[in-house]
C-alpha cells in the first residue's frame, strides 16, 4: 500500500458538463493504463431512472474521456452483506479510480457510513488511488452530511446526517457543501446547497462544523502526492471557520497546509478502525467467496484453463453447501453457473458440469 494518499476531486455540480471534463482527465491521466475505473451508483439508487443515469455517465466517460467505466452497484440498504454487496466491495477494492455523483446526500450516507463501503473508500485513498465525488456524493465526504431533500423539499427542521469524514485523511475537519452559490430560488435563498444561509446558520448552532463550500461547475482537487490543492472551473471554493471566511479562486494551486490550517481538526475524531463484526459470520464469508468467484468467471471466461479451475472451485463449494443442507446458497451457485452457460448435473456424492451447446 502506498504511503501517499491518492488524489480526490470534489465537484460542486456539473460532473458531466464540458466545463469540468479536464478534471476527470487530470485524475485519470495520473493512473497507469489500463485504468480500472468504477462508478458507485448509491446516491441515485432510489431513483426510477437509475439505469438511465448509469448509461449517461458511462457514455460521458466513453465519449469524452475514452474510458470504459464499469458499474459497482449498491442501491438499497437491503443489499448490505449480500452476495451483490460483496461483489461491489471486491470491484471497488480493485479500482484505481472511483466515481460517485448525483442523487440524495442522505440516501448515500445511509448506504455508506459505518459499513464496509466506508472502509473500502478509506483504503482506496490510503493506497494512493484516485476518486471523484460530485454533488450528492461530495456532500458525504466531511464530518457531517447535509440532508438537502429533507430540509429543502420536505421542510424538516435542520439537522445533520453522519458523514464519511474521508477528508479527515487529508487533515481537514469540515462539512462539504456543494452547490454553494446556487441561485435557482430566484426570490428565496438557495445558496449553501439549496438550504439557504438562515437554515445553515441554525445547523451551525445545533452542531458546529467548519464549512468547505464548492460553487457549481467548480472542482476542488486535493493531491495527497503533491500535498497541494487546486481550484478549477467557473466558480470558487469558500472556507468558513469560527474566525473568518476565505475564498480560493479558480485557476490557482495552493499548499495543502493552507487548507489544513483553516480547517483544523476538531477534538471529535472518527475511529480509524470500523467495527466489522457482522461481516465475520459464516454466511457472509460464503457470500463473499461466491461474489469473488463470480467476478473472476466474468473476467476470465475467455481463458479456458482458468475458467475450468474457477468452475471447479464453484462446484466444490456447492457440493460442500449441499452436504451442509444449505440449499439456498447452493442454488445460488447453480444460478451463477447456468447464467454463464454452464449445465450442472447433480448426483448423490458428486456434481458434474459441461458447457451448454
What are these regions (language model features)?
Residues 2-33, 39, 44-55, 59, ...:
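C-terminal and late-domain segments of enzyme folds
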Residues 44-100, 107:
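Portal/gating segments that form or line small-molecule/metal binding sites
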Residues 55-56, 87, 112-119:
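Charged helix-capping and loop-helix junction motifs
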Residues 99-102, 125-145:
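Catalytic nucleophile loop
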Residues 270-357:
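Structural preference for alpha-helix termini/caps and helix-kink/transition segments
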Amino acid at each position: 500500500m502506498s504511503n501517499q494518499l491518492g488524489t480526490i476531486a470534489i465537484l460542486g455540480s456539473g460532473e458531466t458538463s464540458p466545463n469540468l471534463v479536464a478534471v476527470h482527465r487530470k485524475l485519470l491521466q495520473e493512473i497507469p493504463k489500463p485504468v480500472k475505473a468504477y462508478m458507485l451508483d448509491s446516491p441515485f439508487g432510489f431513483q426510477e431512472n437509475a439505469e438511465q443515469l448509469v448509461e449517461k455517465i458511462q457514455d460521458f466517460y466513453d465519449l469524452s474521456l475514452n474510458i470504459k467505466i464499469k458499474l459497482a452497484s449498491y442501491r438499497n440498504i437491503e443489499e448490505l452483506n449480500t452476495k451483490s454487496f460483496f461483489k461491489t466491495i471486491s470491484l471497488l477494492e480493485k479500482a484505481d479510480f472511483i466515481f460517485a455523483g448525483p442523487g440524495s446526500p442522505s440516501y448515500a450516507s445511509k448506504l455508506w457510513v459505518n459499513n464496509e463501503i466506508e472502509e473500502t473508500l478509506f483504503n482506496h485513498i490510503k493506497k494512493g488511488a484516485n476518486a471523484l465525488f460530485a454533488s450528492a456524493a461530495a456532500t458525504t465526504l466531511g464530518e457531517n452530511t447535509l440532508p438537502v431533500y429533507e430540509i429543502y423539499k420536505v421542510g424538516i427542521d435542520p439537522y445533520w446526517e453522519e458523514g464519511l469524514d474521508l477528508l479527515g485523511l487529508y487533515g481537514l475537519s469540515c462539512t462539504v457543501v456543494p452547490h454553494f452559490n446556487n441561485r435557482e430560488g430566484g426570490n428565496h435563498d438557495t445558496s449553501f446547497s439549496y438550504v439557504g444561509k438562515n437554515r445553515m446558520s441554525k445547523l451551525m448552532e445545533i452542531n458546529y462544523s467548519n464549512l468547505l463550500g464548492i460553487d457549481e461547475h467548480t472542482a476542488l482537487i486535493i493531491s495527497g502526492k503533491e500535498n497541494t490543492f487546486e481550484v478549477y472551473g467557473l466558480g470558487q471554493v469558500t472556507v468558513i471557520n469560527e474566525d473568518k471566511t476565505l475564498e480560493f479562486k479558480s485557476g490557482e494551486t495552493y499548499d495543502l497546509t493552507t487548507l489544513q490550517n483553516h480547517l483544523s481538526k476538531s477534538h471529535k475524531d472518527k475511529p480509524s478502525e470500523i467495527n466489522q463484526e457482522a461481516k465475520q459470520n459464516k454466511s457472509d464469508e460464503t457470500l463473499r467467496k461466491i461474489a469473488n468467484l463470480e467476478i473472476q468467471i466474468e473476467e476470465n471466461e475467455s481463458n479456458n484453463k482458468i475458467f475450468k479451475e474457477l468452475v471447479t472451485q464453484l462446484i466444490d463449494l456447492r457440493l460442500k453447501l449441499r452436504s451442509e443442507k444449505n440449499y439456498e446458497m447452493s442454488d445460488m451457485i447453480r444460478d451463477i453457473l447456468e447464467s454463464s452457460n454452464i449445465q450442472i448435473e447433480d448426483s448423490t456424492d458428486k456434481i458434474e458440469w459441461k458447457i451448454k451447446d
